[in-house]
Amino acid sequence: VNGYGTSNAARANPDVYFVHASGDGVLAGTAPANVANVMGRMEYGKMIAGCAAALQSETGNISYLGPLIDAETRRLVNSTYLGAKYCWTEVRGKPIEELNFKVTWIGFWFNIPGVTLDPTQVANDFINGGSDVIISGIDTTEALVEANKATAAGKKVFAIPYDYEAACEQAPEVCLGVPYFNWGPTYFELISAAQAGTFEQRWDWIAPDWSDINNPETSIVGFQKGAGLTAENAATLDNFIAMLADGSLNLYTGPLNYQDGTPFVAEGAVADDTTIWYTEQLLEGIEGQSAP
């Protein structure tokens, strides 16, 4: 469970309000009344990223540059894979056997020399292994940088960075887009509640503003399409986003199995929030570690 440190600090300071983004102490029932947990549903941003990758890939070899391994990062990788799988098979009509989706975890959200794997080396390993799209789950842009170098050297490689709205500006021609968090609206609401004396304990997992996922005033999660995405694929991606928005497409519909064959979502069932939040493994079809 995330949030023991926050909960302990909150108990020691009952007159102070605490906000733990990404935490789940409230969900688990371990947080005191002066704690709020909030998180954006980045799963949607990653589904969009996965779809963009599958639409643009010529080889079907898509790689994911992962940070550390926990429930959050597992569900983000799974969401990326589900988006890629849908757009590869249902939109492009290609066999699932031709989609190769691999994750390598570096061990943290950015490179720490001597501690993590080197994301530059991992990105190059992906490229040398035949991947033509690298999706980043780390906070820095090594995937984009190395895709750009490879493309300049004659290979066509695209990348999808993470969590910085303007990341594509570093190498626009190879950037398919970027999913990102926008915490401003939620923090404004929480601070306003604290000032008004109406702050309440809450665990909120907040969806994008589907009327405009890139509205900085309202949407906690966005996706900026990149210049590397063809016009046709960009239009197709917009249709995919619209299906997520209106609920006509729910990628967490069963049957879905974990890597070891354990049922994750039964046939005909739809995963609830708690099931997704506490994701225990990567999904069947993904190559890579589910646990450290």
Indicate where each model-derived feature is located.
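A residue-level marker of the well-folded mature domains of exported/periplasmic proteins
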Residues: V1-P292
